[in-house]
Amino acid sequence: MRTNAPDLGADLLVAFLNTLDVEDDVDQLADDDGHRRWAGEHGLQPGDREEAQRVRDALRAIIDGEDARLPDFAVPIDPRPGSVTLGARTAAEAAVASAVVLDIQGKLGRVKLCGGEDCRWAFYDASRNGSRQWCSMEVCGNRQKARTFRAKERES
């Protein structure tokens, strides 16, 4: 049976985290239209916009290794014959459910924020040893390596 339920995996979580674009100073959840648009593009109901922002900011902090508290709310459970699924309907519920699913699978640590100081884009680290630091080695990795090189040259 095919449902319209969102895929509660890394892609959804990364997309939700990236509703805040640090480099371009764009927050897709800053207004109701952007929030509705993002939720609709992912097959979700928008829910409360401010709650979605709080959830996003808390999840970004958690992913970045900071101590953060998620707002209290319940993600509905949808029992069906032969399965029990998380019935996330809103953007915030789906993001939290995705994080929980990934954590249960031991994969939440693979969701990271780019080490580029001016980027901070979320990405899923699919490398074999989980050591990727940047969303893109070609862009952010090279920028950071160039900064490090220039700083070392100035010191010597």
Please report, for each region that a protein language model flagged, where it lies by residue.
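BZIP DNA-binding basic region
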Residues: 94-95, 106-150, 154-156
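Short helix-coil boundary/hinge micro-motifs
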Residues: 1-113, 117-124
